[in-house]
């Protein structure tokens, strides 16, 4: 299989000047111009906000956008003091996982999939939206609907990817709702690990202890965990496979 899970127009290289107001980042691009880019990741981005860091941004000519530039990637010093590119656009994570599903890479874990729906209302009050609702093929032994929640994961310690990197009430609610779907449906949590320098995934207990508790309760109740790892380049993202869970 070609490990290029998705390809795109080459990104523009630049230098991070600062990130501010959560949604904005000033970046100096190769021609010396300073542009303001949209930052889709509004969290603390632990270990990623080093002023002067190399970054990559994309450009959109859409007239509907307030800002034509989007911050996509940042280069950091990762494991073994080696440089690694990290994908920081949280909106891109769902595109990656959809590609994984469409390329049948979840077959051994979820079986054959007949239909993919995005942003489907679910939960007791139907006010939450699941990232993907999968309908299995009729040939599958388990014909339950599959609810998939994706979490963009950038924070690491040593060789372990961690989510979340801050307290997340929304994430806590998602775990409660995923657990509530069991056993009538399958619940799946997919950490989308947007850097290659890791070997394991674990809940970010240090940042959100309650999330860690709810995570363990959901796993015990039957929620499936499928951490997916990717390597980021200037014109494509490569598939690096599944990573195991590591709990203390």
Curated annotation (Swiss-Prot):
Q: Which GO terms describe its molecular function?
A: DNA binding
Which superkingdom heads the taxonomic lineage of this protein's source? Bacteria
Instruction: Name the PANTHER family on file.
Output: SUGAR FERMENTATION STIMULATION PROTEIN A (PTHR30545:SF2)
The entry sums up its family as follows: Belongs to the SfsA family.
What name does the UniProt record give this protein? Sugar fermentation stimulation protein homolog
Protein species of origin: Prochlorococcus marinus subsp. pastoris (strain CCMP1986 / NIES-2087 / MED4)
């Amino acid at each position: 299989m070609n490990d290029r899970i998705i390809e795109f127009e080459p990104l523009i290289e630049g230098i991070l000047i600062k990130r501010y107001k959560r949604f904005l980042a000033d970046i100096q691009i190769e021609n010396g111009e300073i542009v303001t880019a949209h930052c889709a990741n509004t969290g603390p981005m632990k270990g990623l906000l080093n002023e002067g860091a190399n970054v990559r941004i994309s450009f959109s000519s859409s007239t509907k956008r307030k800002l034509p530039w989007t911050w996509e990637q940042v280069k950091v010093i990762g494991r073994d003091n080696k440089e690694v590119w990290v994908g920081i656009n949280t909106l891109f994570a769902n595109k990656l996982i959809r590609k994984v599903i469409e390329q049948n890479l979840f077959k051994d874990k979820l079986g054959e999939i007949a239909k993919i729906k995005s942003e489907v209302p679910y939960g007791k009050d139907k006010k939450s939206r699941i990232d993907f609702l999968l309908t299995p093929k009729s040939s599958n032994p388990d014909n339950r609907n599959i609810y998939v929640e994706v979490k963009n994961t950038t924070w690491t310690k040593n060789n372990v990817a961690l989510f979340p990197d801050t307290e997340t009430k929304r994430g806590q609610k998602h775990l409660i709702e995923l657990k509530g779907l069991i056993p009538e449906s399958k619940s799946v949590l997919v950490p989308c690990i947007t850097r290659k320098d890791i070997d394991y995934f674990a809940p970010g207990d240090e940042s959100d202890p309650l999330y860690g508790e709810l995570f363990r309760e959901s796993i015990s109740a039957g929620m499936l965990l499928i951490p997916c790892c990717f390597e980021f380049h200037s014109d494509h993202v490569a598939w690096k496979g599944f990573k195991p869970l590591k709990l203390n």
